[in-house]
């Protein structure tokens, strides 16, 4: 499947949304909203669109894509698994594919969705419901997740955590000699239970090196605030941000498929699945 642009404000992004919907094979929903361009490359979300103002110059539609695997006895509680499916489109005629940012996270989320759907079909439904959200507009200021938390399709109080996946397909400079790692950010900021659960699940399954370098409040890059999970955390919802870190191809046209490490991408995806499965099926919530 080829797409000419992954910029959230290009009509091609709607084709990507449809592809995500068709590929996950679970109940899904498109959350459409409008954004307005100003100053040439800046965008803002329109929270009160009307039949008239959506026809204004610079106004364009975009969509979050949501998928649901309904739980059983605790189905009114939700585990959110998120990624963003937009990138930065093209510059001077050059396509920026964003294979890692965030193609890797989007594919991981879709694989996890299919795994939960398969488990449910085989009679192993999770106790809590799993809400998968592919956000749009992350690169332009977390627009999709910001819109969602202000217009949630389920009450925010029913969401027990967000597991956010953004760039998990590469090996950064700090781990050239040890590829089996993943950075975890934010697991202990709101819920101590989530942090302990995450570490225990890792020890009993993939046993990756969990690197907390970017979790430090003194981290100069402040990655905790730079992806869609922060809009959930700002509403008191526990989160984990999974990433493999930055690399020289970040936001460059060289962020391409051939540079993805599929072996470690698979392991990181499996870890997130096991973590989500444990959260969805445990007796207690997260404190």
Tell where the protein language model's regions lie, with residue ranges:
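Structural recognition of the beta-strand scaffold that forms the well-ordered cores
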Residues: 32, 64-68, 78-82, 131-134, ...
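Short helix-loop-beta-strand segments that form the rim/entrance of peptidase-like active sites
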Residues: 111-141, 162-165
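Short, small-residue-biased leader/transition segments that mark boundaries at the very start
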Residues: 1-2
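His/Asp/Glu-rich mid-to-C-terminal helical/loop segments that flank catalytic regions of hydrolases
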Residues: 114, 243-287
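Solvent-exposed loop/turn segments at secondary-structure junctions
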Residues: 38, 60, 73-74, 85-89, ...
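Metal-dependent peptidase/peptidase-like ectodomains
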Residues: 135-241
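Active-site alpha-helical elements of protease catalytic centers
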Residues: 100-114
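Soluble metallo-hydrolase cores and metallopeptidase-like ectodomains found primarily
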Residues: 6-98, 114, 118-122
């Amino acid at each position: 499947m080829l797409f000419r642009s992954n910029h959230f404000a290009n009509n091609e992004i709607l084709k990507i949304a449809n592809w995500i919907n068709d590929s996950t094979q679970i109940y899904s929903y498109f959350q459409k909203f409008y954004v307005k361009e100003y100053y040439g490359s800046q965008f803002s979300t329109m929270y009160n669109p009307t039949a008239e103002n959506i026809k204004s110059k610079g106004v364009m539609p975009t969509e979050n894509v949501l998928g649901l695997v309904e739980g059983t006895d605790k189905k009114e509680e939700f585990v959110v698994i998120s990624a963003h499916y937009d990138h930065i489109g093209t510059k001077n005629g050059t396509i920026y594919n964003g294979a890692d940012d965030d193609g890797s996270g989007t594919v991981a989320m879709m694989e996890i969705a299919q795994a939960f759907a398969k488990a449910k079909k085989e009679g192993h439904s999770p106790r809590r419901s799993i809400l998968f959200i592919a956000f749009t507009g992350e690169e332009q200021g977390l627009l999709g997740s910001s819109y969602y938390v202000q217009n949630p399709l389920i009450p925010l109080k029913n969401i027990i955590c967000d597991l956010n996946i953004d760039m998990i397909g590469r090996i950064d400079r700090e781990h050239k000699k040890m590829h089996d790692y993943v950075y975890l950010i934010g697991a202990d900021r709101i819920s101590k239970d989530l942090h302990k659960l995450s570490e225990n699940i890792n020890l009993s399954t993939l046993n990756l090196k969990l690197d907390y370098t970017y979790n430090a409040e003194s981290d100069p890059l402040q990655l905790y605030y730079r992806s869609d999970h922060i809009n959930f955390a700002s509403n008191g919802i526990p989160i984990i941000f999974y990433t493999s870190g930055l690399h020289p191809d970040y936001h460059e046209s060289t962020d391409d498929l051939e540079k993805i490490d599929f072996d470690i991408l698979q392991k990181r995806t499996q870890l997130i699945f096991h973590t989500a499965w444990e959260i969805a099926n445990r007796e207690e919530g997260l404190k």
